[in-house]
Amino acid sequence: MPKMKSKSSAKKRFTVRAGGTIKRGQAFKRHILTKKTTKNKRHLRGSTEVAKADVKSIRSMLPYA
């Protein structure tokens, strides 16, 4: 059986942590930032965990992660 391919888009967006949780970056911080408050932009820094409902589909996109 041939190797399964990982989705390139998912490889760029998600990383699987040692505990099995999936890390993702925050959205809404690329442009149109003038109307957003400083507090709002500060909370969008860093990364967060993927929602439990989405984990199964992301794992299928990353078979070897």
Curated annotation (Swiss-Prot):
Belongs to the bacterial ribosomal protein bL35 family. The keyword Ligase does not apply. One of its GO terms (molecular function) is structural constituent of ribosome. One of its GO terms (cellular component) is cytosolic large ribosomal subunit. GO terms for biological process: translation. The keyword Metal-binding does not apply. This is Large ribosomal subunit protein bL35. Keywords: Ribonucleoprotein, Ribosomal protein. Gene3D superfamilies: 4.10.410.60. Pfam families: Ribosomal_L35p. It comes from the Bacteria.
